Amino acid sequence: SGKDKIKLQKKKKASVVVAAKKAGSAKVQAKVGKKKYVCKVVVKAKTVKNGTSAGTKTTNKPADTKNATKNPSNGQNNAATQPTNNPSKDNPSKDNPANPTATPAADSDVPKKNEQDVKKLQALIQTLNQKGADISANLDDESVYHWNKEGRLTEIYWGEKKIIGAEMADFNEFTALEILDINNNNISGTFYVGDLANLKELKCYGNKIDKLVLDTNKNLQELDCHNNQISNTIRLNDSKNLERLYCSNNKITELDVSGCDKLQDVDCSNNLMSSLNVSDLPSLKSLNCSRNMLKDDNLILTGSIGLINLDCSLNGTNYDFINLNLAGFTKLESLNCSEQPEDGGTSADDTMEFDISACTGLKTLNCSYCSIETLDVSNLSNLETIDASGCNLSEITLDGAVKLSSLNINCNEITDLHIPETNEIKTLDCSESLGIETINFAVLTKLESLDVSDSYVPELDFSICPDLQVLNAMNTGFGNPDATTDNEDLPNIDIDLKSNAKLKDIDMSMVNVNVLTLPENDIVANLSASNSAVTQIVNLEKQLGLETLNIAGTGISALDLSANTNLKQVSCTESQKTGITGVDESIIYIVPDDSDDGEDGNEDGDDGEDGNEDGDVELE
C-alpha cells in the first residue's frame, strides 16, 4: 500500500484505508508493557479507468464497426458497436453490482450497532459530560470505542476524560464489555465489578477509589488499579484467568490471589500488607511487594519456583529477610531485598549470613543497606551485578562468580577483598571503606570505572587498567597506612595515568599526589585535583576535549590553558587566578582561599580543614 508506517496512539486506536487487489478489513493489535495499541485497516480494491477493479480481466477491444458492416458474415453487424464483455459473475464491470470487488463500500464490514448498547452508552455519555467530563459522543471513534461483529460494545477507552461521579453500575449493562479503561479521572467511592462476566481488562488506575470488589469476574486477565485509595482486602481467588495485577500505591491490607494459576506479574508495592501468600503460583514471573509492612517471614513463596524478578525491599523493622526461603528458585534472575533496618527481625547476637546459594540463575543482587555480615556468591556463575553497599559486611566470597561485571561494596567493614583472577569486573566501588587493607587490583584488567574515594588503598599501577574511563579517588590515601593514619601524614606520590587512553572523568581531590600524569590523547573531559598536593599536571595541554578543571587549593600557581579550547569552567582560588592564562575570564570560578582566613576559618564560620564548604566543585 505504501503506508508501511502508521502512527498508533497510546491506549488509543487508529485507522487507515489502503488500496489493494481485493477488498477487506483487519484489526491489528499490539501490547508494549501495559500499553495497548490498536489499528484498523480497511482495504479498498484498486480500480482502473474503465471502472473495473484491479486484477479484474477486461474484454477485447470493441470490434471495428466499419469492417463489421462490410462483412455481415462475421456475425457482429449491429453488435459491433458494443463491447463484447457482457456483465456477468465471471466478467464483472462497473454496472454489475453483484461483483463484490467492483465498488466496495468502506463500511461494508461494519455491523449494525446493538440498539440497547447505543442507547445506554449515549445516555451515560450525556450524564457524565453534564458533570464536567470530556467524553467523545462519536460512537464510531475507534480510539474510544470498539464493537464486535454482532454489534455489541466490547471496549471503552475513557482515560483522562475528567470523569466525576461514575460508578461501576453505569457499565454493568454493557454485558459484552471486555476492556474498560477509565484511568486518571476523578472517580471515587466503591467500585463493584460483578456483572461483567466477559470483562478481560480493567484499568482504573489514577483515581480516588477506596473500595474495589471483584467477586465473579472469572475471565479477568488484567487488573490495573494502582494509585488509588483502596483500603479493603482484594480477593481475586475466583479470577482463574488473571495474568497481570498492578495494585501499587494504595492502602491494601490483604491480597488473596490463591488459585490464580495463570498469574504472571504482580506489583503490590507501597501498601499496608503485613503478610503476603503467593505460594503455588506456577506461572508467576515477577513480584514487587516492596514498601509494605511485612512481618517476620510472612512472605510465602513456596512452590512459585518460576519466579524471575523479586523485589521485597523496604519492608520495615519487623521483616526478617534473612530467613527468606529461596530453595528451588533456580530461575530467579533479579533479587532486591535492600534497605531493611538493622533490627530487621534478627537479633544482634545472631550470625547474619544471607543464603542465596540455591539461586543459580541470579544475575542481579541488591542487598544494600541491610544487616549482613557475610555474603557468599561463589555458587552463582551467572551473577553480573552486586550492590552490597551500606551493609555490615566483613567478608564477601566472589570465587565462582565468573560473569560479575559490577561490584559495589562501599561503606562496609571488609578488610581483605579477594577478587578472582578470572573476572569480568568493569565497575568497582569500594569507597568509604577505611578498613580495607588489601585489594588485588592487579587482576582488574577490564576495569572501566573505579571509586576508591574516602578510603586508604595501596599504591595502584593504573597501567593494568587500559579501559578505565572514570576514576574517583577523592580524599583517598594512597599507600599502606593503618586505619588511624591521617592523609596529611602520608608521603606524597606520583600518579601515572598515561596508559589509560579511555579515561574521561578524573577526581583526584584531597589526595597525597604531587605529579599527576594524564593520558596522551584528548579523551579527558572532567578533571578535579582540588585541595590536593598536586603541583604539576603532565599532558594537560593535550586534553583538547577538556570541559571542566578544578585546581583550587593545589600547589599549581601558573597554568597555560590556551590549548584547551573546549573548557567551560575553570575553578581556582583568587591567588591562583593571576597565573592562569589562555582562557576567557568569564569561565573562571573563584573558590575562596583558605589562606586568607587564618587557621580558625573565615568570618562566616567555614572552619573545617578544607575551608569553605562550597570550595569543591563536583564534576558533572
Each model region followed by its residue ranges:
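N-terminal capping/linker segments that flank leucine-rich repeat
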Residues: V28, S93-I179, N186, A197, ...
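Asparagine/serine/threonine-enriched low-complexity, disordered tracts
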Residues: N50, N60-K61, N67-N99, T103, ...
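Conserved hydrophobic beta-strand positions in leucine-rich repeat
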Residues: I156, L180-I182, L202-C204, Q221-C225, ...
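Canonical leucine-rich repeat
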Residues: A166-A169, T190-F191, L212, T233-I234, ...
